[in-house]
Structures are given as C-alpha cells and as structure tokens.
Amino acid sequence: MVNSKASSFRFSFFIHNSAFIILFPPSFSRLLFIPAIGYLQDHLQSLSTSRLMSEERLVSGNIIDYPAPVYSYRRRVTREVPFGTIFLGGYLPIRVESMITAHTMDTAASVEQCRRLYEAGCEIIRLTVPTEKDAENLKNIREQLRRDGIDTPLVADIHFSAKAAMKAVEFVENIRINPGNYATGAKFSSKDYTDDEYRAELDKVREEFTPLVRKARSLGVSMRIGTNHGSLSDRIVSRYGNSPEGMVEAALEFSRICEDEGYYDQLFSMKSSNVRVMIQAYRLLVARADAELRYAYPLHLGVTEAGDGDEGRIKSAMGIGALLEDGLGDTIRVSLTEDPVNEVPVGFAIVKKYNDMLLVRGDRAHLPVKHVIEHERKSAGHVQLPFEPFSYSRRPSISIDGAGIPVGGDALPGVETAAHAPITDTESLRDEILARLDPGKPEDAIRSELVSVGVGSAEDISLLKALLDSLGNLREKIVVSTADTSIVPALLPLCGRVRLDIVEGETLGTGLIESLHDRNAAIEFCFIHEKSSENVPAEVLVRLAAKLKARGLQRVMLSIVSDAPLYSTRKLALELKKAGLDYPIAVRYRRLDGERSGVLIQSAIQAGTLFCDGIGDLIALETNMPASEEVSLCFNILQAARIRMSKTEFISCPGCGRTYFELEKTTALIKQRVSHLKGLKIGIMGCIVNGPGEMADADFGYVGSGKGRVSLYVGKECVEENIPEAEALERLIELIRQNGKWVDPV
C-alpha cells in the first residue's frame, strides 16, 4: 500500500488481484478499481520494499489512532490461522504455548518434555531448531509423539538458518521466524545504510525468505513472524534504532513478502524483556498492520527473559495482560526461567478472564475480517486517550505532601498498604502498623511507606488519637480512611492524609468541601467502584475535583478502588486532562479473597498496566496476602513497569535447546551473590540468540557461548569471551567491581 497526502485530502492505493485500488477518505463512499499494467505493478512492489516507502507510511497519517478499545473490553477480531488440529484468532479461545528446553537432537528427552507439557494442558509446543540436523530430527520427535497419541501442534523456532527452516517446515504445524536473525549479516555494527544499500539488503532478504514462504504455503503450515527487541538487524537499527518502531518495521517487511506471495497464514509477536517496550511495540504493530496489511493477523503475546518466581510471573502478567485488556492477543507464552511445565498454569490463569468473556457476535465469515475491524473503528470515531500508546510519558500532576512522602510531580510512586486489624483492637493494630512500616530497616529498604487505618464512626476517634500518640513520629505515615463524611473535619488535624471513601449510591454531606483547607492533612477522594459503569467514578471525582480547584485547594488526591480499576482509572485520567486538572492519582487494587496466584496476576495486570501507561503517583494494594508479600508485590509491580527500581533487576531467559548450562541453578546462584545491588540490571542468557541484543537493556550480561563456556558483557559489549563456566560467576562479580557498581552486602 502506498499513501499520498495533499493539502485537502489523503488517499491510499495498493495492488490486489491485478487491480489498482484507490482508497479514498471516509467522505468518499466508493472504491475505484483501475486495471494495472505490469510495469506499474512491478514498480509499486519494488517501492513497497524500500525504507522510503515505510517512512511515507509513517508521515502520511496511518498512525493517527490506536485502534484498540481502552475503556472497555472488546477483542480485536483477527484472521483465523491454522495450527494443525486447532486454529487461533477470530473468536476462538486465546491459546497457551510453551517451549521445551531439551536439545532437539535428544529425541527421548524432547518427547518426554512434550509429553509433560501435553499432560499439563499446553495447547502449542515449541522446539528450537538451530541446525539442519535438528530440523531433520523433528521428524522422529513428531512421529513418536503421534504414536503416543499426542497431537499437540508443534512450532519450529528458527533464528539464523534458512536451510534449517526449509527442512523444519516439513514436520511442524507452525514455523517461527525472527526477522532480526534470518537472512542477515553481521550484528551490532555501526554501519549507516544509504537508501540504495537498504533496498539492496531488503532484496536479499526477499530472495532468501521467499522459498520458505512458498514451501510453507504449499504445505499448509502457518508462520509466526516474531521480532525480538534484542535481536534487530543492523539494517533496521541503523534507521529506526533499537526501538518499537524498528521492531514493527522488521516484522512488516517480512509480512509484505508473505502477502506478495499470496500467503496469509501469518501471526506476529513483538517480544522484549522491557515490559513497556513490549506493550508499545504490539500497540504500534496493530496500528500500522491493520492499516497497511490485507488482513488483521493474530498476535502471539509474551515478555521475553521475564525471569523466575514472582518477578517473572508479574512481568509476564503485566505485559501480556495489558494487551489482553486492550483486546489484543490470540495466543500467549509465559517465559519463565523454570521447568517449562510451570509456565502452563500461569498462562491459563492469565487468559481465563478473557476466554470467559468470549462472546460469539454472529457469523460474519462472509466478510473479510479486516473489513469488520475497519467498520467498527470508523463507526466508533476518534477516541481520546489519557496516555501515549506508542511511547512512555508520565501523566503530569502537581506534587503534594501525601502523608510524610511526596506524591505526584516527579516523585517516585509511593507504596501504601492497609492494616487489617480493627481500630477497636488498638494493640494488634499498632503491632501490624509497625510490622508494615518496619522502622528498623535501612532507609531505602523494601517496606510499606504508608499504612492506612479504617475509622468507622465518631466513637472511633478517641481510639485513633491514642493509637497515633503511641506511634510517635510514625504518625505522619498513617492514612486514615473513612466513609463517614461527617467525621472528616475532625480527622484532618490528626494525621498525614484522610481518605474519604465514596460509596456508590450515597451522597456526600453538605458543607464538606467548604470545610477543607490545605493547612490540615491532605485529602483523598476514593470512589468505591462496584456495579456502576466505567464512566461513573470519573464523572463523580472530576466534579469534586473541579470544585476543590475552584477553592484553590492543592493537597488533594483522587483514586478508584476495585478488583478491576484499569478502565475506570484511565477514564478518570482522561476526564481530568480534559478539565485541565492535575491532582495526583493513587492506583488502588482491592481483592480480599481468591488464591495467591490469582491475586498476584490480576494486581500486576490492573495496577501495572496503569503505571506502564504513565498513570499513577502511588500504589496501594489491599489483598489477603501476608503483609511482607503484599509489600514486595507493590515494589515488584513498580519495578516491572520500570517506574521505580528497588532491587537488582534480573533479565533471565527460560532456556531452550541452545542452552548448554543449568540455567535455573545458575540464575539462583547469581541472584544469591548480587541481589543486593539495587537498581543494577543483569542479563542471564542461555545463548547468543537474544543475549547480546538484550544486553542493551542490562548493565552486565552472563551469556552461554558453548558447552561449559560463558561470555561476559558490559551493556552490549562482550568483554570476556568463552571463559570456563566454573569461573564465570566470580569473574562477573569482579567485572562489576571494576566498573564501580559493586557494594558489599550488609
């Protein structure tokens, strides 16, 4: 597709079935079909491969709106793509995928891991295929699995070898291609490409990639075009940087080749270890692909190198869930540095909510899926967003004293948790507050910075005074919450902040706003959202905020609390923006029942997505978790969103058949030795495939380079190559020392 922009209108045209099709703006209610001569068709296809073409798409206005809904759930309807015995996309359930870590040449071990994944319910199984020999052995693995009655679709994971891809496609249901590694030359050079050089390199890619496309089409095998943030080609990086724009363009280049060959069984992935980059890349891909490509192709979602334990689950849930909440995603993989079987239940826990919401909207099979999506987008009109979907910028807000810590402005988001003991049990409540604030810890330790205490009526005020007096200087860390409007004036002189809970269907007492002033505690208006629409909390809070602003009040915060605050808080941010109001927003998530894993996943999605969007000046969780775990969850969410670093960040891959050391054991050992280095980012990679590239997002890297061998990196630069694995950890620590990043553990 080519776009042209004139002063009065914009149009696009593309070649389809030997016709020259002009797409006019919505004001033009027709398509013009003009027969295309061979020269024009060849010329346009050549243009479509050039970087100049890509830039014209960008400047012509294709990227105007993010086409996904952000205030309610509606799934993006995509073309259904075959995966052997199943399909994905369309209105079908969101599928869960995993990947074995056994070497593909080890038939028995590979079959055993596939069997265990099958028994765990895994719907798609991926295997790494680094060489032609590995590709040939897929036949043996497949045959044994089918003899055992296991018909789970298999995916061949290809990075560098076109020959391996040509063989592997014969034995799998899907083949994954990494555009950054496939048919590319040297990596991480600083070469600047001229337009002619760029076009020539892209022509080479087309020449090497087209045979695979034709073979996959003839065999009925689908293809995932999977870009990784850490392994973009030099050609792409030279023009777009190591960025979401580069990730998207890399994938679209390969997709255009597929479409030119009449091959439409495609899907995309845009993976990164940086959750924000991953979210931005998928959103940008959807905006561009739905505008430029023939079909709306399915998406495979995942955060690569997410790590292990709670951190890995939180990062995966946040990145995947943020996109699922926007209606994007047809299959997912949770990449954990653990046994692959552990990924499966986490994946199903993430997609359950969305699969449960899946509604059949009628048979529209007679219409191309893209037409359905375009119709919905046009009928919906322009939707204002309170955030930048393709880049990060924090929502502007004023800075206030929010109870002993700054809230809003440029301040790092604070952490608040709620005490569960009642005010009537003063001794237990005091003990719980001290356990949460943990004043004996170092100043920068992970602990709750604020604790909220509930007060139900005027009779509780004397108990509150006694409690606050017993806390001494810590009283400024106490947030008092109440739903009783009448006692707010009495509470304001006592503590650092008062939170007034606004209950649906109830009215605020008269005279409250007139009684407020900035000399007392800050006040937070918190809407308890239960049954009303997503618009109601924002409407109520913005009306209140406008009145407070008119009175000149500064020490004001706003929030919405529920077990699903994402859509309503986005709406609040939008309405505040439209009204020119810049009070800080607290991100609140409350869920006091359910299993730990569900609470962890949903809080990461609901709260974490808002911080990735740049919305939120404080995080406050109320859960059934133990206090220490709840506090850790708050900090883990902020760190995964890259909004506040509170400990060492480990970027560790899940391993695959390319890995020649014990990744889980090694990761645990490295964590044990360096986890006290707050804010430092350390990459632990099984092999070179994503390793050096993802080092761009890490300060130091530990990357497998062969059997018993490891290479060490500073950023993307390899500084020690092929050193013995037994020496690697100590040499990594020494490298950290040499670069002035080491401090002795306390």
Swiss-Prot record:
Cofactor(s) needed: [4Fe-4S] cluster
Alphabetical keyword list: 4Fe-4S, Iron, Iron-sulfur, Isoprene biosynthesis, Metal-binding, Oxidoreductase
GO molecular function: 4 iron, 4 sulfur cluster binding; 4-hydroxy-3-methylbut-2-en-1-yl diphosphate synthase activity (ferredoxin); 4-hydroxy-3-methylbut-2-enyl-diphosphate synthase activity (flavodoxin); iron ion binding
InterPro entries to which the protein is assigned, alphabetical: Dihydropteroate_synth-like_sf, IspG_atypical, IspG_bac-typ, NO2/SO3_Rdtase_4Fe4S_sf
Recorded catalytic activity of this chain's protein: (2E)-4-hydroxy-3-methylbut-2-enyl diphosphate + oxidized [flavodoxin] + H2O + 2 H(+) = 2-C-methyl-D-erythritol 2,4-cyclic diphosphate + reduced [flavodoxin]
GO terms under biological process: isopentenyl diphosphate biosynthetic process, methylerythritol 4-phosphate pathway; terpenoid biosynthetic process
Cofactor binding note of this UniProt entry: Binds 1 [4Fe-4S] cluster.
Pathway entry: Isoprenoid biosynthesis; isopentenyl diphosphate biosynthesis via DXP pathway; isopentenyl diphosphate from 1-deoxy-D-xylulose 5-phosphate: step 5/6
Enzyme superclass (EC): oxidoreductase
Binding locations of [4Fe-4S] cluster: C653, C656, C687, E694
Highest taxon of source: Bacteria
EC identifiers of the protein: 1.17.7.3
Pfam families cross-referenced by the UniProt entry: GcpE
Family stated for the protein in its record: Belongs to the IspG family.
HAMAP family: IspG
Function noted in UniProt: Converts 2C-methyl-D-erythritol 2,4-cyclodiphosphate (ME-2,4cPP) into 1-hydroxy-2-methyl-2-(E)-butenyl 4-diphosphate.
PANTHER family on file: 4-HYDROXY-3-METHYLBUT-2-EN-1-YL DIPHOSPHATE SYNTHASE, 4-HYDROXY-3-METHYLBUT-2-EN-1-YL DIPHOSPHATE SYNTHASE (FERREDOXIN), CHLOROPLASTIC
Protein name: 4-hydroxy-3-methylbut-2-en-1-yl diphosphate synthase (flavodoxin)
